[in-house]
């Protein structure tokens, strides 16, 4: 990893006095200096411009490694080169003080136990490479000053075909600069965080089983860097806090993730989004969280989280992958823009399924089950819009937009099916909505005065209660809403259009290019004629819907004081 630093201070550790006096152990044999070109992480501000430039991969290094001789309290490495540890360290550590030189350490079927600090401590080096051979174990009881079983002040790259079992009373692996992992099998049990790369994290491969009281993976340099990229690997992560907690941008383009955060979706979130408190007052238990942006280009991701499954204080972009989410709060949440360009998304459980300041669906296969809204274009952080009714500050905000341009969408919501606190546009795709059975919500909802619900293409079938049901305000293809005098269950047909709702319904909204203007159609439920409608206008309403307070009949859905949108 390229580093422009010319000097590094040799700050002494606070390890045990025995370890400090162990310096000076003789190193036998011929020292082979490895010529290493650093690994440079190049992250752009926009997530679609993520790139990583790598120099010489550590796995291509050649030459014989020098075998380390273990002293009473461990080993100290003071110059660059390749070193191999084949002997257990029962009470001590490996310390690297090599100034600006590159150092590679090979762990070959060893165990290191240190009750007074890290098992491996890199105080100074240009780049530190750790190769795993065979089965290796690190056990560390450390302090807040050196808070990882592996603690490196400089860039670190870990690779190899071996395994590493880490037990730590604080963090598992800590890199204060850039941290890259290209392979290996990791089992980490940490009372706080599993793996921390302050400046950046890049994972291209490996198998990870992480149990952490804090976060699973974490970056923390909020002033300059803090990005993370995952291109491969298999991850099983169980955390007391967030599964992935990235201070800047997160990109996932490959890998298989199984993340359980907090107590999982079986526990309803009680943090600020419910109580209106500051998030610092309670622990975050999100599955995947990034302060700036989350971008998913590929991979298979399964999240079971107490709080949001996906969360960004900025934007969320889904370009591909297979994503399965269960959440005690939101399935996906972006304070700003949430864009879905492809992939398969299945939100099996959530309070609100997919939420963002703006939501744009261009493609993808999406299924959402939510106890409140399925899609909610509301915006703002969870901390600014509490769950308590009447606290919503986004009603009638034309900057909040839900747009569906393509894809296949299914929503089963107990609240509003598709909800925008501003405008709602459907221009393509196929959208099915099983909306609420209660009359306090509707299959479709959009903002107050000045906002619109416009249909210019695609297929929409939305069913649910009639109390807050709304039709489109404008359309370029034939659209009809039928409100019935009583509730029905069972399959419906309307001309060539058919659908089998999952629950009872009293309102049916259909927009499709299969409907012909001027034609008469009969709504059939369970093969029984229920109601005939002649489509004399592009937008037709048959039957009576309820109205929300202060609004004209059928103009809007949802209640202004009826909970967060």
Where are these regions (language model features)?
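A composition-driven surface/loop motif
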Residues: 2-565
């Amino acid at each position: 990893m390229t580093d422009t630093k010319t000097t590094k201070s040799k700050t002494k550790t606070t390890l045990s006095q025995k370890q400090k006096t162990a310096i000076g152990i003789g190193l036998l044999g011929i020292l082979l200096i490895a010529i290493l070109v650093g690994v440079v992480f190049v992250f752009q501000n926009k997530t679609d411009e993520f790139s990583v430039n790598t120099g010489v991969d550590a796995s291509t290094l050649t030459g014989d490694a020098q075998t380390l001789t273990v002293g009473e309290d461990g080993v100290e490495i003071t110059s660059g080169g390749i070193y191999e540890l084949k002997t257990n360290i029962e009470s001590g550590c490996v310390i690297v003080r090599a100034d600006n030189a590159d150092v590679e350490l090979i762990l070959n079927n060893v165990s290191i136990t240190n009750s007074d600090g890290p098992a491996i401590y890199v105080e100074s080096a240009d780049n530190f490479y750790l190769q795993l051979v065979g089965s290796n174990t690190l056990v560390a009881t450390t302090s807040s000053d050196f808070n990882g079983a592996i603690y490196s002040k400089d860039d670190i790259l870990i690779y190899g075909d071996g395994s590493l079992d880490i037990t730590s009373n604080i963090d598992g692996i800590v890199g204060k600069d850039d941290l890259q992992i290209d392979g290996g099998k990791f089992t980490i049990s940490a009372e706080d965080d599993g793996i921390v790369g302050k400046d950046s994290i890049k994972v291209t491969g490996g198998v990870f089983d992480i149990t952490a009281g804090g976060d699973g993976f974490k970056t923390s340099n909020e002033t300059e860097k803090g990005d993370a990229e995952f291109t491969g690997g298999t991850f099983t992560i169980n955390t007391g806090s967030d599964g992935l907690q990235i201070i800047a941008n997160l990109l996932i383009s490959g890998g298989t993730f199984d993340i359980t955060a907090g107590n999982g979706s079986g526990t309803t979130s009680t943090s600020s989004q419910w109580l209106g408190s500051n998030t610092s007052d309670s622990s975050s238990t999100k599955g995947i969280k990034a302060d700036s942006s989350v971008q998913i280009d590929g991979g298979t991701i399964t999240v079971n989280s107490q709080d949001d499954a996906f969360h960004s204080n900025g934007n969320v972009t889904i370009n591909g992958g297979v994503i399965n989410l269960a959440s005690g709060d939101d399935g996906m949440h972006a304070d700003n823009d949430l864009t879905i360009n492809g992939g398969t998304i299945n939100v099996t459980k959530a309070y609100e399924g997919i939420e963002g300041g703006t939501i744009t669906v261009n493609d993808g296969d999406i299924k959402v089950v939510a106890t409140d809204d399925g899609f909610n274009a509301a915006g703002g952080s969870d901390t600014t819009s509490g769950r308590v009714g009447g606290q919503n500050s986004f009603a009638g905000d034309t900057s909040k937009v839900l747009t569906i341009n393509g894809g296949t969408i299914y929503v089963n919501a107990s609240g509003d099916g598709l909800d925008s606190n501003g405008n709602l546009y459907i221009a393509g795709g196929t959208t099915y909505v099983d909306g609420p059975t209660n009359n306090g919500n509707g299959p479709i909802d959009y903002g107050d005065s000045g906002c619109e619900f416009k249909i210019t293409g695609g297929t929409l079938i939305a069913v649910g209660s009639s109390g807050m049901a709304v039709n489109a305000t404008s359309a370029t293809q034939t659209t009809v809403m039928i409100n019935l005098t009583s509730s029905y269950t069972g399959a419906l047909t309307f001309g060539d259009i058919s659908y089998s709702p999952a629950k009872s319904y009293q309102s049916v909204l259909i927009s499709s290019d299969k409907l012909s203007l001027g034609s008469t159609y009969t709504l059939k439920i369970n093969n029984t004629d229920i109601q005939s409608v002649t489509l004399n206008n592009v937008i037709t309403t048959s039957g009576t819907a309820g109205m929300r307070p202060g609004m004209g009949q059928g103009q809007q859905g949802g209640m202004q004081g009826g909970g967060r949108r």
